[in-house]
Amino acid sequence: FCSAFLGYEKGIHAPGIADLGAGRRAAHHLLLAHGLALRVLNINSPDSLNGLVLNMSPTYPKSDCARDIEAAQLADDFLFQWYAQPVLAGSYPDKAMAHIPEHLRPPIETGDMAIISQPMDYIGLNYYTRGIFHAEADNAFVETVPTEAELTDMGWEVFPQGLTDLLVNLHKRYSLPPVFITENGVAMADKVVNG
């Protein structure tokens, strides 16, 4: 997510490219590299535990209106399930793929999805906050930052219930290997004491 989406699609991280097609191609090739690495690790270190760590946030609609509910579901598929579904179910989410113009979709070769979706010994999840989304005329989904909630110094909502919701939703959607919470918490202004 960080290198593909933030680096190639949004241009926030290195290499600073803001291009939907480049981001989706980078994501596909990262997932393909993961699958190829699993093969090598399983052959050369058969007793090791091998898996993948994903950044994920549950998505919620801003309101109960059908368009906002649909926007939140598309945001989940487009931002998070795009990385989870290939490794856990062997395909990209249909709604997310349909949201990408055909000429910007990643080139998926015969056999790619089988490589990507090899069984893993575990999956790691990095969770920090939830995403709240609504629909707008020009955009399928737009993220809303809640103004009434407690926010971290990074502007992320403090929302512990989101971790439970994320785990429950993933369990309903996929047959999961063992799950590890590999990152979570909040970023706040720390004071250095005696240091």
Task: Describe the role of every protein-language-model region.
Residues 1-195:
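Active-site region of glycoside hydrolase catalytic domains
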